[in-house]
């Protein structure tokens, strides 16, 4: 896609809509966006691409100020992502293809995690979040669903965690349960998830978690 502005700080991957259709849960498939979708373009960033943001590694003692700063950073990054995705969308529609953008959101329609995996931008680590072997934990910014046929990336089939248990040990709320050789993330015990889904009531009830499982990951430092 020569001529389409994509920031050097962003990761871009291409996934087959057919494979995402099979792997995503009901209600979060490409067909819930667009009939006859063929491709999903994923825009994301890894922690190493944010290494100039000191707060990403060292969360401040005042959660309110830290949370506001994080929100401001996310807003700016997603604002940049919207410009990029709109440019790609316009490029595709000018070529006669359909394209729909889906910005990141906790209540979004598309299965972002599965899209990241299929686009080769990360693998599921022990903590159930996506990890790029070089850039670290992956933050999805946006996706584009299109009926354009594209060359798809290959999922990464590697173990990025090995014997590391830092993310599991960092959670004091018991949000990870061992199932066989893997760990299962328990949403109702995750304070970050609760805070995002219920920001007013739970912010003061449980206290902050500050995504310690993600920040504990040593990859991409």
Describe each model-derived feature in a short phrase.
Residues 1-73:
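Non-catalytic, usually N-terminal nucleic-acid engagement modules in DNA/RNA processing proteins
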Residues 23, 62-221:
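Catalytic cores of enzyme domains
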